[in-house]
Amino acid sequence: MEKEKKGAKHELDLSSILQFVAPGTPLRAGMENVLRANTGGLIVVGYNDKVKEVVDGGFHINTAFSPAHLYELAKMDGAIILSDSGQKILYANTQLMPDATISSSETGMRHRTAERVAKQTGCLVIAISERRNVITLYQENMKYTLKDIGFILTKANQAIQTLEKYKTILDKTINALNALEFEELVTFSDVLSVMHRYEMVLRIKNEINMYIKELGTEGHLIKLQVIELITDMEEEAALFIKDYVKEKIKDPFVLLKELQDMSSYDLLDDSIVYKLLGYPASTNLDDYVLPRGYRLLNKIPRLPMPIVENVVEAFGVLPRIIEASAEELDEVEGIGEVRAQKIKKGLKRLQEKHYLDRQL
């Protein structure tokens, strides 16, 4: 398995490529036409200096791309060269002559050529097989075979069901955490538990987003379901991190990204997660820890984040914010008498709500 950082870059590249060839795009329509006609085809997206080195013969077209043009030109034996954007057909019926010493795991001539050209030029190369009836994408060392839309929809719907289950578990864990925060009983074990729940939900979301990109226009309903299920999930996870990271950080999303880049194996290692949050690996799971209060303060309606920052800066931790009088809150920069009362009442309502939720 590749190292995580390299894997993250690969996923980013694949994500953009899948959007480029997704259903609903002119390129995908043309590719599907070629596939149905059983003619096969080889398409290179981009025409840089490295591509020029491997292209021989053919004829210059330089015309606007259309699915019909691609279909007709694919009837010829040679490869088709598109512009970087895919909006123009530059050359047709060209012969590709990549370096034969470049390794290839493919057996068929078309796919072997496609893989070598992709490695040599760094461009996206698309091989359409008339025998296997599949479309394969190559770029550098990446290879991806496009899947049937029905198959992807099935996988996406299964992932949505899994997401719903994990979201339910996360909600229960968060409700328990809310009550513990008001009671000053949060332990490092609780923090790790919530971190794991957030991360699992976000990983499933990222997997579904890949399906959505590959589905193109067919993935609209799946996208709506994800939005309905986990709106602002990253923002809430980032506030949770700001609450419990040892040293204050300006951008919790950087740390959240590091968490998402971790392998599943590392994520299960408590000491690695501790280190990410700035705590020593020897930290006792049963030790108590106080939240700063970002996440709960953010739940108070119409309380801007700069004001939340000022409150946390003034009092340090959530218990001190809860204990503060309206007069003490009023002294914080940006908070007047009305807003001070609003914070007091907002925290009280949250405390009562979470107490009732826990009783249920």
Curated annotation (Swiss-Prot):
PROSITE patterns the record matches: DAC
Consequence of gene disruption: Decreases c-di-AMP levels in mid-exponential phase from about 3.8 uM to about 2.8 uM in strain BG214. No change in sensitivity to methyl methanesulfonate (MMS), decreased survival after UV irradiation in transition and stationary phase, strong decrease in competence. Cells lacking this gene show a reduced c-di-AMP level compared to wild-type and cannot properly trigger the DNA damage response. No effect on antibiotic sensitivity to the beta-lactam antibiotic cefuroxime (CEF), upon overexpression of the c-di-AMP phosphodiesterase GdpP increased sensitivity to CEF.
One GO term describing the cellular component: cytoplasm
Induction context: Expression increases during late exponential phase and at the onset of sporulation. Transcribed under partial control of SigM ECF sigma factor.
Residue stretches in coiled coil: none
Catalytic activity field: 2 ATP = 3',3'-c-di-AMP + 2 diphosphate
Location in the cell: Cytoplasm
Effect on the protein of changing D77N: Loss of enzymatic activity. Fails to form the normal DisA focus. Cannot trigger the DNA damage response. Increased sensitivity to methyl methanesulfonate. No change in inhibition of ATPase activity of RecG
Documented EC number(s): 2.7.7.85
Annotated ATP binding sites: G78, L96, M109, R110, H111, R112, T113
GO biological process: DNA repair
Keywords: ATP-binding, Cytoplasm, DNA damage, DNA repair, DNA-binding, Magnesium, Nucleotide-binding, Nucleotidyltransferase, Transferase
Major localization listed first in the record, in broad terms: cytoplasm
Free-text note on domains in this protein's UniProt record: The C-terminal domain (residues 290-360) is required for DNA binding and to inhibit the ATPase activity of RecG.
Function per UniProt: Participates in a DNA-damage check-point that is active prior to asymmetric division when DNA is damaged. Forms globular foci that rapidly scan along the chromosomes during sporulation, searching for lesions. Its ability to scan through the chromosome rapidly is due to its non-specific DNA-binding. When a lesion is present, DisA pauses at the lesion site. This triggers a cellular response that culminates in a temporary block in sporulation initiation.
NCBIfam families named in the record: PRK13482.1
Annotated protein name in UniProt: DNA integrity scanning protein DisA
Record organism: Bacillus subtilis (strain 168)
